[in-house]
């Protein structure tokens, strides 16, 4: 196998030679997961964009990957891509695989060179270039990004971009162009000629655009509190920041101690200077360069000292650490049908995870397999997993790895497991205690590069501690069934499970493998679906008008064309195209040859179809006596929707709603022409509700929302059939007369598919709770007489959500007055969602459940002859007269028998509990060879609820619900136990979607291994990633010393809590936010403190419309101050959302940090995607100030808290008096008086706190100046 050269020792000239070789390219064999046959391609490095590209021909790149996204370069034939092409023989030392991507499941590029020397060269070169890319300065990254934009529109890698291409690019990077005049004016400013920009001009255009959009942020440096005062900021070069000013800024505003060295300050400045003439002993930054620095990762909010490992912290007992832990590590997705993969183990281990789970089952040939038992998840070999663990366990972190074994294997296969552990892991496997007489766990340092087995262990007499209660429900009937769909008249596959005499089923499993065979389209019809085919255009003049309008808008490119049916000759067509500023027409003639229709423009060249003819002349020139020309851009047909079954030209809103209400399926839809306007509406069903969304016309485009542009309604529908339109709903069922007629025949089907019947309407449970209630996230002081003033935590009732970011509501004595919507959160919807969660809490399918059948209300019968082309069918016949039967089918007779017996036992009231117990009693044997490998992590179950007298050699595992119960009832006992013993907490079985629970309260009580689903990009996994970013991402973080104090209480009563710090945050702007779909983002930011319940708080900014490239909040956004009780155990979290066309928030990016690791000042917040992977150039700019609370100030903050609580009580009492007439009484005036007095007092307290902060900043700035 090829070994990688140590590139750090190579001299610079050798590195340059290697990079030059990669840039020239190498012909290699490319292995693909999607193609069974390897292909020869030229693979080369594009230095300007930092991308690896592969191509068949020089002018057409087939694919590329960003070098910054590379996670691993693996030598040899160590990927599945090579296994799929076993017939192709390549030496292992010529092969390697690049693993890359920003999701949990990585993409692969598997390559084979023709020589070992080439392989070594590429392995070394990629490592050199990856290091350079990861250390590149922000200006270098910007230049690379700009190159990518140019190359994305022209793969020839030319050094310029046209006005038309620029207009295309800007919406793709999240910026809405107001019109072509806006761009032309910008081109004049930068001196571009003839609507064409060189790369240097494109770079200048970018700099001017970003500066003009965000220059208002620099007003922050014109205030008295600033440590230096900026001059004119109207233009990028209007004023400058000089060396001494920059040093003062770094030292006193940013509190950067390294800035005491002027040489380091000078070096930092020169990275951001765009003109080498200014790289002198006294450099200066123009104001646009200073603004770029503020947004740069060099100015990050994260303190880099926490990227280093603190070896002094690694000598405590293992029980004193939080340990990064994974649940069901082998899965890449949900718990029902996702793929199991050894790569998932590798991904977790290389991400620093130190406790991984192996779910072991008996496999073929006497060798165990790993998968999620009784589900459709794929199976992987135990031996392969152990090999992967050995190879990757200590790449990222050298500290111990714990293997948590979920054992389901027979004794014989357990012996094989023990054999593989010993043979493969060798000296890495811990087989005896580090100290024979120790009374506590060893430290991570003592266990470096050791692998610990967590598994049941035989006692002195051969008995084993097995908790039968934990296992008794595990053997249940679950799996895939076909259900007969009476609407679509077909079988659909669902994941089903039986529990508590109920059969729960998931949504239908979309066919990904057994797709319907593609119907061959006759050659004469191939052109029907092409955008250039316009069918029968009214007249020649109409065709000319279409071409003229399109060319006027897009730049009049010769060869722009459309095809239409001939007005004069049957079976013939007309090709209309643009040449030299006018429209020309050619007749496409047809003729019969041997019974086959042929089409031609010239007699000597005929084609079998119109499609083939057009494709030919798009690649070859159309030659005439007067000219020769190649067809270029097609003019899209503006009205292809008129022939679609989902389109209705004359349909009112009410009629559309009536039609949709009769189709009880999410994803049912139609599009209708709106009356009296040149606009349309899409009416669809989602979450059981019928919704409408307007589609406007903008020139030839159709616009959904404000910035999702489509060439046609057909393109719009096609797009949203593949992508979510509303939340997770995609368009699936066109509402046609045939579908409505079929539904009328099956009118009772709603009783089965109306999923909302699973949930209880919140209004039925709590009718006294007013509708549309919101909760204040922060204090707000009215600035006008028609606005509300309220404190944090206030409940505002009867809210009217009006457009423009200002809502109306009732608070205290003020009725229907305005307040900013970003200061509140909607708790009505939150309560409903929480209720829904509680109702599905015990459902075996959890949130994936789409329906429940109560088996006590059905009789089960077999269909001996099968039904609807399925041989193995059983039917649930309702006991209630008039209800519809439900038909199920299986693929095998054995499955039919198992499901039939399970349901019949329930319907016959057979108690199977005793049988299950016996099943598990027969299966609790442990192989002594495997038992002997267990040293420190012996699970205990029988007495695990008793937390006294912990044994450091044991580990106690709790499902999240049990752990939550312990935390609520005896948090101190759990904390004391964890000071000596180990606990592991794992998600409940109902989390079949692989969602995660909140780990914070468990961390607070000292639980070391809080196992989460690493493959799920949710809030709690992001918090986990933030916690373990400490201590050099080793996977071990030492718990605060205060947690080991006898006086420490993880859940102290309110009287014992003290505010230790205030954190002031102001969101100023953002750059390069990611783009989700067709629409340009309308972003807003949520700032949240995550911690114990008393430390949790959040705040939202306003929404910026149609700008995800350079949004600004600085002029309107106020500073927000959070009170922190425990800075060691709290997180600062920035969430960036976009508000979609339905006013729903959609996640864009996040940044989550332990508060102890953040820095003060004007700081860049580099943004990450859901998987906590960096997003190129995406960042927020925030002002952040941390300030310890003095003892003299604690009384002031305590008074504020007490007043806020009292105001909440008074507000709710006043609301009852206002809404329930019979409750009015004499006490109301007293309540109003107390409410108003408290409100004034609270405002005075808050102003006093803010004044102290301002005085401190101003005095500091004067001192520094």
Swiss-Prot record:
Top-level taxon: Eukaryota
Post-translational modification: Phosphorylated on tyrosine residues by CSF1R. Phosphorylated on tyrosine residues by BTK and SYK; upon ligand-induced activation of a variety of growth factor receptors and immune system receptors. Phosphorylation leads to increased phospholipase activity.
InterPro entries per UniProt: C2_dom, C2_domain_sf, EF-hand-dom_pair, PH-like_dom_sf, PH_domain, PI-PLC_fam, PLC-gamma, PLC-gamma_C-SH2
GO cellular component, one term: membrane raft
Record localization: Membrane raft
Domain SH2 span(s) in chain numbering: 532-635, 646-735
Span of domain C2: 1038-1169
PI-PLC X-box domain boundaries: 312-456
Phosphotyrosine, modified sites: 753, 759, 1197, 1217, 1245
Molecular function GO labels: phosphatidylinositol-4,5-bisphosphate phospholipase C activity; phosphorylation-dependent protein binding; phosphotyrosine residue binding; protein kinase binding; protein tyrosine kinase binding; scaffold protein binding
Reaction catalysis annotation: a 1,2-diacyl-sn-glycero-3-phospho-(1D-myo-inositol-4,5-bisphosphate) + H2O = 1D-myo-inositol 1,4,5-trisphosphate + a 1,2-diacyl-sn-glycerol + H(+)
Transmembrane stretches, start-end: none
Catalytic center residues: 327, 372
Class in the EC hierarchy, top level: hydrolase
EC number: 3.1.4.11
PH domain span: 20-131
SH3 domain segment(s): 769-829
Keyword terms, alphabetized: Calcium, Hydrolase, Lipid degradation, Lipid metabolism, Membrane, Phosphoprotein, Repeat, SH2 domain, SH3 domain, Transducer
Pfam families: C2 (PF00168), EF_HAND_2_PLCG (PF23583), PI-PLC-X (PF00388), PI-PLC-Y (PF00387), SH2 (PF00017), SH3_1 (PF00018)
Cofactors required: Ca(2+)
PI-PLC Y-box domain segment(s): 930-1044
GO biological process, one term: response to lipopolysaccharide
Subunit structure: Part of a complex composed of EEIG1, TNFRSF11A/RANK, PLCG2, GAB2, TEC and BTK; complex formation increases in the presence of TNFSF11/RANKL. Interacts (via SH2 domain) with CSF1R (tyrosine phosphorylated). Interacts constitutively with THEMIS2.
Entry function: The production of the second messenger molecules diacylglycerol (DAG) and inositol 1,4,5-trisphosphate (IP3) is mediated by activated phosphatidylinositol-specific phospholipase C enzymes. It is a crucial enzyme in transmembrane signaling.
Name this protein carries in UniProt: 1-phosphatidylinositol 4,5-bisphosphate phosphodiesterase gamma-2
Organism: Rattus norvegicus (Rat)
